[in-house]
Amino acid sequence: MDEENKPKNKKQKITIKANTQASSKLLLKREYIVEQKQKPLLLNKIKFQEPLTLTKEIEATPKPQAKETKNIKIKKTAAKIVSTNIIKLGEQDKKNKGKILTVSNISKSLGGKPILKNISFSLNHGQILGLLGPNGAGKSTLFNLVVGKIFPDRGEIKLNNEVINELPIHKRALKGISLLEQHKGLFGSMTAYENLYAILELHIEDKNKIETKISQLLSYFGLQYLVNVKANNMSGGEYKKISTLQRICNKDIKVLLLDEPMAALDPLSISSIKKFILELREMGLSVIITDHNFFAIQDILDNCLIIRDGNVMVEGPPRTIIKDEKAIKYYLGTGFKI
């Protein structure tokens, strides 16, 4: 072909091969993933079957209309399938707006010392409940009672109207109660994909189903860019998000207990985690959060308990608590005014 007949405007194609040993944050940003043709984000043990291709236009040249339309339809359809499958689960669960968890007159002593005294509260389907109080108030003990690490001396715990007092922790997990503790989570030398895969392969034999599940979760929460990032290289907020996905990925979770999910995070990460928790609720989960900082989380809470010395001192929606002098006294002490 002579020079005159050659197209004047061409796309410059840059081919980047994935390197699992190097940082993959830049490689796997969303705009790069969108450029993968007809390929969902399904990885085989972090090994790409073919190099990713990023196309950069130097001068705008229209593509053939039919081809462009086809690609767009494929991408939109794939994204829609991933999102809709998960959202439908949440919508189905949220139809039941009654109580999913009921704690009635629970008491517990440890080493002869009363820790909890006649605690009662309930959690509705799709609700976010805040459990607040100073150190030693009994928040962790209450979490351990709900999840089944320890058993109450008196009182009753119900999940969907079924008494679960005597059920051990693994049976409560099978019924849909999961706890994410503050200092426990991922294998630091493993990527987000590997950490999720390690849990899922214990429950799912089909490799393709595992990869599809991982793709759905990461896509739904916009975390595809972390797929090849090792846990040790994640920010605090990213680490907690992947840790949470690890808890909910392999079972039908109904109640998720989060132990101080905002601890040691900067303001931007706190904002990101709060958005993440709201997205968990949209999936149909009911969430209980422990924290010391009422003002950091009050905007995402539906209801709140303030515990002091093993007793529920205040219960109510945050907008009511923040205006109540008695509540502020129990939470922040005397002499404090907002």
Predicted features, each with a name:
Residues 155-163, 175:
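Conserved ABC transporter NBD signature motif
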Residues 256-260:
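Catalytic Walker B motif of ABC-type/P-loop ATPase nucleotide-binding domains
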Residues 147:
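Helix-to-loop junction immediately C-terminal to a conserved catalytic motif
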Residues 208-226:
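Conserved ABC ATPase "signature" region
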Residues 101-103, 116:
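Conserved structural motif at the start of ABC-family nucleotide-binding domains
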Residues 132-134:
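The feature captures the beta-strand-to-loop junction immediately N-terminal to the Walker
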Residues 230-234:
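Conserved ABC ATPase signature
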Residues 183, 189-201:
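Q-loop/switch helix immediately C-terminal to the Walker
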